[in-house]
A protein has these predicted regions:
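Nucleotide second-messenger and two-component phosphorelay signaling modules
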Residues: 31, 50-62, 66, 77, ...
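GGDEF/GGEEF active-site signature
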Residues: 85, 89-155, 278
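Conserved long alpha-helical elements within nucleotide-processing catalytic cores of c-di-GMP signaling
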Residues: 29-33, 38-62, 69-99, 105-113, ...
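Cyclic nucleotide signaling catalytic output domains
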Residues: 104, 147-157, 161-179, 185-200, ...
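Signal-transducing coiled-coil linker helices
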Residues: 2-35, 42-53, 193
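Helix C-cap/alpha-to-beta connector motif
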Residues: 267-283
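Active-site core of bacterial EAL-family cyclic-dinucleotide phosphodiesterase domains
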Residues: 197-254
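Catalytic strand-loop-helix junctions within cyclic-nucleotide turnover domains
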Residues: 115-124, 140-141, 145-165, 172, ...
Length: 283
């Protein structure tokens, strides 16, 4: 009958609508979910965290970056299957502690992000993440210590990007100690000053080298027996155009990490050779 056909058509239409809605939900979830750990991914975290901070600018938050210490060794010793299981266990542990009152995500590799309100309870929960016990091949328990860097956000400033707060949490994470259980570190103003100095050094090092701001000094070497100078040690200082003399203890570690130390070494060699040639020419 016509009524039956109308009913069937309505059912088909409803089924199509339900399917379309389900597909939209599925693809949206797929877009925002990390395929391995099944927790939100960084894209979802960034979008949602900004909304939370914008809508709660009167509250204080903690933005946390964490990863597994020596995760590469876990992969090398036990294989990638165990490595993946470790990441899933970390995600499960984070989810169990913060699913009610926090935002969390897998950022990349073995790195995870957490955003929670700054309360004593949440600080204790973050501290409790430090050590994770996992089972290897269902027999061996293996302790996986986590490195945790936390950036406090007393009042959210929209002028500062969320990426900046994440960078600060990552900097704090680098300060975590390998001794005892000191695997959690909070970002401080002192770290900020060191970060600003590092950024200044890296942004100006090439210009400074080309402009001859690195000055070579010669420290005499004495032979005590004869009380005579037998040589000299070449020392370099950075005579910055605005900041004045910068100690090598400040810029050398930065150069050693980013590889610019090679350029500086060749510059010093060149200055030493020029000095020696000048002395030979002068007789």
């Amino acid at each position: 009958t016509n009524k039956q056909w109308i009913f069937i058509i309505l059912l088909v239409i409803i089924a199509i609508i339900v399917f379309i809605k389900w597909r939209e939900y599925y693809y949206k979830k797929l877009l925002h979910t990390d395929t391995l750990t099944q927790i939100p991914n960084k894209q979802y975290f960034m979008k949602t965290a900004e909304k939370i901070l914008d809508n709660n600018s009167d509250k204080s938050y903690l933005l946390t970056s964490l990863d597994a210490r020596n995760f590469k060794l876990i992969n090398e010793r036990f294989g990638h299957i165990v490595g993946d299981q470790t990441l899933m266990n970390i995600a499960k542990n984070i989810k169990s502690k913060f699913h009610k009152n926090g935002l969390y995500a897998r950022s990349q590799g073995d790195s995870f992000l957490i955003l929670v309100e700054d309360t004593s309870q949440n600080r204790e929960l973050l501290k409790s993440l430090v050590d994770l016990d996992i089972s290897i091949h269902n027999t061996t328990n293996y302790k996986v210590p986590l490195k945790i860097g936390v950036c406090p956000i007393p009042r959210y400033n929209p002028a500062l990007s969320l990426s900046l707060y994440i960078d600060r949490a990552n900097i704090a994470k680098k300060y975590t100690s390998a001794r005892n259980t000191n695997y959690i570190c909070y970002f401080t103003d002192d770290m900020n000053k060191k970060l600003n100095m590092k950024n200044m050094i890296e942004s100006e090092m090439v210009r400074a080298l080309s402009k001859g701001e690195f000055v070579v000094y010669y420290q005499p070497k004495y032979e005590l027996a004869n009380d005579t100078i037998i040589g000299a040690e070449a020392l370099v200082r950075w005579n910055h155009k605005e900041k004045g003399i910068i100690s090598p203890g400040v810029f050398i570690p930065v150069f050693e990490r980013n590889g610019f130390i090679v350029d500086l070494d060749f510059y010093v060699y060149e200055q030493v050779l020029k000095m020696q040639k000048h002395r030979l020419d002068m007789g």
